[in-house]
Amino acid sequence: MGNRRLAREHALQTLYYADTGKTQGKDINEYKEDFKDSLDAAGFEFCSGIIDGALEHQAELDKIISAYAKNWSLNRMSVVDRSILRMAAYEMLFSPENTPVAAVIDEAIELAKKFSTENSSRFINGLLDQIKKERKNGQN
């Protein structure tokens, strides 16, 4: 498994815990430290950047996701799907990494296939594709 994919998996787990409030008294930075040994320095920095960025921009990301999630409120989405969407939207719109958008979407789909329901990958793909099109048109 690639270092960035593993970093995204760890970021997803941390964002999941943050969203559900099941941090068991742990600070988000403590969760990040739990993953330090399984990633190289670049992977750990990438993982931390996604976590910090998605949390910092969460209100903006939620507005953007909500705008494209026709007939789906954020609260109606599974926590896993919501976390994947926040991560991917953050990477697409705010991350300084400049990861190609197609790669971000592909990784989000793979995370959904691994950690969510059968239909989640299609839902996530469709929503992120809409964000990509708007971004390309300069509207985000």
Curated annotation (Swiss-Prot):
Cellular component, GO, one term: cytosol
Origin superkingdom: Bacteria
Coiled coil location: none
InterPro entries named among the record's database cross-references: NusB-like_sf, NusB_fam, NusB_RsmB_TIM44
Stretch forming the signal peptide: none
UniProt keyword annotations, A-Z: RNA-binding, Transcription, Transcription antitermination, Transcription regulation
GO molecular function: RNA binding
Entries under SUPFAM superfamilies matching the protein: NusB-like
GO annotation terms (biological process): DNA-templated transcription termination; transcription antitermination
Main function: Involved in transcription antitermination. Required for transcription of ribosomal RNA (rRNA) genes. Binds specifically to the boxA antiterminator sequence of the ribosomal RNA (rrn) operons.
UniProt family annotation: Belongs to the NusB family.
Protein name per its UniProtKB record: Transcription antitermination protein NusB
Originating gene: nusB
